[in-house]
A protein has these predicted regions:
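Conserved, function-critical positions that sit in or immediately flank catalytic
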Residues: 180
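Structural signature of tandem-repeat unit edges
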Residues: 1-59, 69-84, 93-96, 100-123, ...
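Short alpha-helical DNA-recognition segment
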Residues: 62
Length: 251
């Protein structure tokens, strides 16, 4: 599927933005590649109806997401002119919605001349490599080690990933607020012992002092879990089909 740019579109990001309607894209069931033609600078993925649009009155955001599940897109090619996503109220299409919209996505190509993003081993980073922006939903490989240069992980970077079983967080990462929602095969989160902000024990993610439980992997196969006595708060309620018993300390 090739997406063309807008002719005489104006000089603002909003006017130049090319919107991909996920419900319409789902009609191309056999398409494997989504390509943005030369001239496409700003992109948005429409994942919910417009407010006040009478044509969309009976359509919900959930309908758009159901359509996204039908897409077979495995690769997205952004044009050499691509600048960045347009931050519409549908959400940032790269930093928030990419995996949600494209569950079979394995590869993304972004020009080396792009000022905001780069792709390394099929993972999207900020241009300087200090922020991991998005780990693609269907990227092959069961394990991944975050590069030492990385300082930050985007909140949605590991949501809706389907093959990843273990991830290792490097010593310089400082992000505590990261979602691993719907990472159904993830069994283990490891953290470098040199990390000053995060820690892990038995594959579970905590803050360094282990006073806050940050993430219990969705694919961890233990049938029971005893929360450490040091834990005072939980940022995340375990969503795990294998767990039958959860032991909570008195305090």
């Amino acid at each position: 599927v090739v997406i063309e740019g807008k002719a005489n579109s104006g000089n603002t990001e909003e006017l130049q933005c090319v919107t991909v309607d996920m419900r319409k894209l789902a009609q191309f069931k056999n398409a494997k590649v989504l390509k943005f033609a030369k001239g496409v600078k700003y992109v948005a993925f429409k994942t919910k109806p417009d407010t006040g649009d009478k044509l969309d009155d009976k359509i919900t955001g959930q309908d758009y997401l159901k359509s996204a599940d039908k897409t077979g897109i495995e690769k997205i090619e952004f044009s050499s002119d691509f600048v960045k996503p347009y931050s519409h109220d549908w959400g940032n299409c790269i930093e928030e919605k990419l995996n949600q919209c494209f569950p079979k996505l394995k590869k993304v190509s972004i020009s080396k001349n792009n000022k905001y993003y780069k792709v390394s081993n099929d993972v999207i980073f900020s241009k300087d490599g200090k922020k991991l922006v998005m780990y693609l939903a269907n990227r092959p490989g069961k394990s991944y080690k975050i590069p030492a240069k990385c300082r930050k992980i985007g909140y949605y970077a590991f949501e809706n990933v389907h093959n990843l079983k273990s991830v290792t967080i490097s010593k310089n990462v400082k992000s505590k607020n990261v979602s691993f929602a719907n990472a159904e095969k993830l069994e283990k989160i490891s953290v470098s012992k040199k990390n000053k902000v995060l820690a892990s024990k038995n594959g579970v993610l905590y803050n360094k002092k282990m006073t806050t439980l940050l993430e219990y992997p969705m694919g961890k196969k233990n049938t029971s879990f005893r929360i450490p006595k040091t834990v005072k708060t939980m940022d995340y309620v375990p969503d795990n089909i294998f767990m039958k018993k959860l032991y909570v300390p008195k305090k």
